[in-house]
Amino acid sequence: MDNDGTIVDVTTHQLPWHTASHQRQRAFAQSAKLQDVLYEIRGPVHQHAARLEAEGHRILKLNIGNPAPFGFEAPDVIMRDIIQALPYAQGYSDSQGILSARRAVVTRYELVPGFPRFDVDDVYLGNGVSELITMTLQALLDNGDQVLIPSPDYPLWTASTSLAGGTPVHYLCDETQGWQPDIADLESKITERTKALVVINPNNPTGAVYSCEILTQMVDLARKHQLLLLADEIYDKILYDDAKHISLASIAPDMLCLTFNGLSKAYRVAGYRAGWLAITGPKEHASSFIEGIGLLANMRLCPNVPAQHAIQVALGGHQSIEDLVLPGGRLLEQRDIAWTKLNEIPGVSCVKPAGALYAFPRLDPEVYDIDDDEQLVLDLLLSEKILVTQGTGFNWPAPDHLRLVTLPWSRDLAAAIERLGNFLVSYRQ
């Protein structure tokens, strides 16, 4: 009705939003900064798996290191402590994390031989290591800065480097040498724009545990070129046989080193998202960078508080992971079965993992003519309802590897690898 009392037909009266609806709608595209950001562990093939599950199919997920679905439960003492702490975990904490948890991190590394001393102000807690990696690279990198990352790698490092405007540069690890980093290749990749060196040890996806000699050579190169050291050591307690883990910071007490670790794997609480970052070495020339990490920590307000209460009891209590990796332990048994069964498949070879939760088998190109390993993974999913991840998803340059987690029960793991072998016998692209 108009002001003069006349009834208006709203079906023909041109209202502003009515006119706009006849115009071309504005498109909202993905940001250009995501153009080079990939995370194939939960990529397109994972979406196909979700569709199959919705249709009622049972999918054996060997694509992600998530212990809980395979019957690996957190120690009871961790669960009890979190439940008891819930009434006190309703508000925000300090942006770096609660003091008791940060003290527990400091105490943990006092027991690591040669690890440089640091205090609670050098510790940042995070919603898993993943958040802390992203924060660190956002605080560090300007457009075009280069970060040396192993190939194969845990792809979050490459994705987060690209997201921060940096350029990931991959140095090769040598399969013939147990997946140890190729020092000559690493040195050849260093340029004036190189800012940091990422070391993933024990390695995901290969399971390699780096020798003291290799780590020393890597540190020597970083020292020569004044590179920041970024040490991803989330699997440092998941070691098999006589493997010994050496923390990178312990070899480089004179260098700025950021060590990343957390509860997700060794303490089987991946869903809690409880990680930490410890900064060691001389900090006087990195105050602005560290201030940037603090700024980003403030912006996210704080890590989730209930999970922070798991850190002190986890680090100070019985280390139950040892029961799983020593002789008779479930993780060791499953590692052995995966390695043995994979090497029994004609044309497939696998370096024996010395740590972590994965196998990274090679498909001999002389036997398997694979041009597209993502298509191979999709075809395996559709045929066998087994979900793995293609090797190129870990920034390996050739389509000749797969990554499988070794978390399923031995019987299920052996059956899955047997089905993989049967599938490969007749597979053609």
From Swiss-Prot:
EC number annotated for this UniProt entry: 2.6.1.2
Annotated CDD domains: AAT_like
Catalytic EC class: transferase
Keywords, sorted A to Z: Aminotransferase, Cytoplasm, Pyridoxal phosphate, Transferase
Reaction catalysed by this enzyme: L-alanine + 2-oxoglutarate = pyruvate + L-glutamate
InterPro entries hit by this protein: Ala_Aminotransferase, Aminotransferase_I/II_large, PyrdxlP-dep_Trfase, PyrdxlP-dep_Trfase_major, PyrdxlP-dep_Trfase_small
Compartments where located: Cytoplasm
Positions of L-alanine binding: G65, N204, R403
Sites bearing N6-(pyridoxal phosphate)lysine, chain numbering: K265
Obligatory cofactor(s): pyridoxal 5'-phosphate
Oligomer and partners: Homodimer.
Family recorded in the similarity comment: Belongs to the class-I pyridoxal-phosphate-dependent aminotransferase family.
Full protein name: Alanine aminotransferase
Encoding gene, per UniProt annotation: aspC
